[in-house]
Amino acid sequence: MLYYKLAVCAYGADTGRERRMTQRMKTVLGCIRRADADFSMIQPGDRIGVGVSGGKDSLLLLYAMALYRRFCKTPFTLEAITLDMGLRPFDVSGIQALCEQINVPYTVIPTQIAQVIFEIRKEKNPCALCAKMRRGALNDAARERGLNKLALGHHREDVIETLLLSLIYEGRLHTFHPNTYLSRSGITVIRPMVYLPEKHVIHVSRELNLPVVKSACKADGNTKRQEMKELLKNLTRTYPNLREYMLKALQNKEQYGLWNQKIAGIETTETEE
């Protein structure tokens, strides 16, 4: 069935439902192609690992990158990586089946992240530490498997929510960059879906019936990021174009665009925290 859907997206559709799916996938691929062009994400011979948590964002990224690989003029390889956080239940059989259907190698990496956070550290606000540990584990896994790039499924709203988090809780203007070289690990982290609105992620992942894995984290849905999501939703009711303008501000070369280094063709380098 997945191959059929890939073919529909690639070569056209007959029914109304197929045409809608084709158009939505074209939107997804168009956003990825634009990000790739703007931030020089993919180079010939890249070995790209896709971090797959089991959520809708990372699964759509995996699916879309497998399709993008067929049309991209730059040859690259893909591999999917999932971290076993130690949370239960943990069933990735659906992800495994998806990877087999789209011909992408799949690896599950065992970790003790949940044990460290909830049993040893007993963190009341675990998200920052969890994110740091997950980044480190993914970078290590990518390096050990001979990959040179790691693709993450952050979309447009993730970019804006991170900017709001930094502003409100840290007093600084900061968000993640679409293309970042990590000097310590030698891995480049790319985020091909930074231009893609979350509403498209929701629609397309449902349309494709991607095997979303429900999060087993006890902190899920009760985080500062969720607060920012609600804040952004409320602000958008008053200012409908807010999301577009905030993303535009990040790229504004005439002012202080936080992304203007890459727009100008200069690679951003960071060290892992």
Where are the model-predicted features located?
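Electropositive phosphate-/nucleotide-binding environments in soluble metabolic enzymes
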Residues: 22, 26, 59, 132, ...
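Catalytic subdomain that performs nucleotidyl-dependent activation
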Residues: 78, 149, 157-237
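Short, basic, helix/turn surface patches
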Residues: 131-143, 179-185, 232, 236-251
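The feature marks non-catalytic terminal segments
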Residues: 210-273
